[in-house]
Amino acid sequence: MEGFGRNEILNWINDLLQLDYKKIEQLGSGAALCQLVDIIHPGKINLKMVNFNAKYDYEYIKNFSYLQESFAKLGVEKYVEVSELVKSRPQANLEFAQWMKKYFDQYYTGEPYNAIERRIALKIPTDKDRSSLKGKTAATGAPPTSKPSPSSTLKPATTAASKPAPVSKPTTTTAKPTPSSVSKPVSKPTPSSISKPVSKPTPSISKPVTKPTPTTTSTSTTTTVSTPPSTPKPTNTPIPSTTGKPTLTQPTFKPTPKSVSPTPPVVAGSTVTTKTVIVSEPPTELLEELEQQKRELEQQRKELEEQKSVIQEMTEKIANFEITIQDIEKDRDFYFERLREAEIFCQDHSDVPLLGEVLKILYNSNGEEEGEEGEGEEQGGEEEEEEEEQGENNIEQEEEEQIEQQQQQQEEEEEHERETLSEPEPDQDNSAIPLEQLEINDEEEEFNQHQEQEEEDEHFEDEEKVNGLNEEEIMNSVLQNASDEDDILESTFDGNEDDSLLQDEY
């Protein structure tokens, strides 16, 4: 609907509904939109209740309520922003009018429809409709009354004189009747002949245009009173007289008293239109309801703003949580890879006792996780921990036994060496051999003691490291010990004579 602008929409609505809208904001009353729905779906909207002359917001809201009811009946899923349309927002009214044009082009069947006749039939005309109606009635009404001429006013009198009233006995009268003969029938008419007597003539009759001319006949004498041009022409009917007295024709219409009004006199042939403007103030109840609805709308807007702020905060927190989760997953993968490498290394060198301890520590985590799941599982985890502690104690005891056995073997070897060194050799002198043997024995004892002390210190240091260090430090210490052992195995003695003797003995 981007091709339709404001002027095109206004021209389309004015031509279709025969209105005179000047701005697109006038569609905010909702009346024209309701009649568009009546054109597309006749009888599906309560058009009789729509106010085409609405001027206040609460009247606009009522019109839009009828529009929403019709949408609900027809199943039209269109959200109507009543608050924006009622405030005469140009963009909102233009967008809704464009949607109505699209809906009209899609569902209108092409049946003939006269918008003015429809509004007049439902008694909801606009101001333009009323003015056009008044113009039509003035054009198609009774023909305008022209000012009567004196000849036309005297014409019925002559006709009345030409037809004398029938009498039973012919009588003759004088040529000049007295004025009393004329005034008496007017002042005191007979009850049988006149339905309502006229006691006093109206001011319009008091000054006739022409003087009454008596007419003489052989049978009877009749006098006629001509009416002035300003009075309407009465229809005179002759009254039969039983006597030979002169008779006066009486009008058949009932004279009505003239009401004195401050309006200027009406000129014949002209039409006067009176327009009454009634300014009615809206009832207080509706105003209170409108104010209450405005308050509720403001409160709902505040709540929506608060909810929007809360939603923004939650989205920001969720984004931060996602970032932290990604960082944690990276750290987890990093440390898991390192632990896996350590596990593989320990499995490859499982003959080393320290690495066996490391493997036990690595495999001990499953029992702890299972122990956290329930009370029964906690008990099983405690039992496993006790078994592991017992196993560790057994391993320590075995290591201590091995150390004791090694010490005993070393002591036995030392004693054996001492015995072998204490025996004299036959090829050497008795004086020189004991001195050399004593020196060698002293050096061997010092060397053995120093070596035993170093082994004990290393053993205790290893135990302390295993108990107080983490996995990485344990791995580093194991690798360092292995390198130290390799250095010891690859080391050689010096080229001294004493060292060569010891080497031969070993």
Swiss-Prot record:
Gene3D superfamilies: 1.20.5.1430, Calponin-like domain (1.10.418.10). CDD domains: CH_SF. Keywords: Cell cycle, Cell division, Cell projection, Centromere, Chromosome, Coiled coil, Cytoplasm, Cytoskeleton, Kinetochore, Microtubule, Mitosis. Interacts with mtaA/CP224 at the microtubule tip, centrosome and kinetochore. This is Microtubule-associated protein RP/EB family member 1. Disruption phenotype: Defects in cytokinesis due to poor mitotic spindle assembly during mitotic prometaphase. Residues 127-268, 365-506 are annotated as: Disordered. One of its GO terms (cellular component) is spindle pole. One of its GO terms (molecular function) is microtubule plus-end binding. Residues 134-228, 251-261 have a biased composition (Low complexity). It is found in: Cell projection; Cytoplasm, Cytoskeleton, Microtubule organizing center, Centrosome; Cytoplasm; Chromosome, Centromere, Kinetochore. Its main location: other. Pfam families: CH, EB1. Residues 3-105 form the Calponin-homology (CH) domain. Belongs to the MAPRE family. The keyword ATP-binding does not apply. PROSITE patterns: CH (PS50021), EB1_C (PS51230). It comes from Dictyostelium discoideum (Social amoeba). Involved in microtubule polymerization, and spindle function by stabilizing microtubules and anchoring them at centrosomes. InterPro entries: CH_dom, CH_dom_sf, EB1_C, EB1_C_sf, MAPRE. Residues 367-403, 410-428, 453-474, 483-506 have a biased composition (Acidic residues). One of its GO terms (biological process) is mitotic cytokinesis. It comes from the Eukaryota. Residues 283-344, 377-459 form a coiled coil.
